[in-house]
């Protein structure tokens, strides 16, 4: 059965009854955001962007992950930007997924090192792809920041490759799109760029154990 966020609490098969261990479904971006909160004790409110093979996000409010009434808050990957755009895995066209997931870099995740070596060494084709990606990402961030005016954390597989020049370019693009004067103070690179999903998935169980000790 194909699972989408918001459907995980309405499964048609009894997963829990099939496993001898406690289990829960957590959206990967929510897990990553939990890890981010663990790494940043002073972080209170933020919008976490998981920039990986697929695009995902999590909304952090008062150090809690907000999933919404139906479980699909922050599933920004399926915001339709272009009805005639590329087909998304959800079956619709032109979703943010088709513009801001790492698949748009036209390389396998295993080849990200090579791709960014080309970008930083001024390879023309690689830079064209990267600039197009940053423009689309800036467009998405600007739209979301108008809705949730908080810190935006750039995480996922992309995070270790981001440099200050990339952040500066995002601010520049956002400034050209937003109707408001924006301070360059709301974009941050993830503090937990590696193993954040697995760590975040485990942390609630660790916390539960510590509370029982």
Which positions does each model-derived feature cover?
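Glycine-rich phosphate-binding loop and adjoining helix at the ATP-binding site
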Residues: 1-45, 163-176
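Glycine-rich phosphate-binding loop of actin/hexokinase-like ATP-binding domains
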Residues: 44-99
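ATP-binding/phosphotransfer module of carbohydrate and carboxylate kinases, centering on a glycine-rich
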Residues: 21, 40, 87, 92, ...
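Short, solvent-exposed coil/turn elements at secondary-structure transition points
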Residues: 29-31, 82, 193
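Short, active-site-adjacent cap segments at secondary-structure transitions
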Residues: 31-33, 56-57, 66, 159-162, ...
């Amino acid at each position: 059965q194909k699972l989408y966020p918001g459907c995980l609490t309405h499964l048609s098969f009894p997963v829990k009854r099939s496993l001898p261990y406690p289990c829960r479904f957590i959206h990967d971006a929510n897990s990553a955001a939990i890890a981010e909160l663990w790494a940043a004790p002073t972080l209170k409110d933020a919008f976490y962007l998981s920039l990986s093979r697929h695009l995902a996000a999590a909304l952090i409010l008062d150090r809690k992950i907000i999933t919404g009434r139906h479980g699909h808050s922050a599933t920004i990957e399926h915001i339709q930007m272009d009805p005639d755009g590329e087909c998304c895995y959800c079956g619709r066209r032109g979703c943010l997924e088709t513009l801001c997931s790492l698949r748009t870099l036209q390389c396998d995740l295993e080849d990200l090192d090579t791709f960014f070596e080309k970008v930083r060494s001024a390879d023309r084709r690689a830079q064209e792809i990267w600039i197009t990606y940053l423009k689309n990402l800036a467009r998405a961030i600007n739209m979301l920041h108008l809705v949730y005016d908080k810190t935006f954390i750039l995480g996922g597989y992309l995070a270790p490759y981001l440099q200050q020049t990339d952040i500066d370019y995002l601010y520049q693009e956002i400034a050209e799109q937003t109707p408001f004067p924006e301070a360059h103070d709301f974009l941050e690179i993830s503090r937990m760029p590696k193993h954040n999903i697995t760590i975040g998935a485990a942390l609630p169980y660790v916390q539960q154990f510590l509370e029982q000790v």
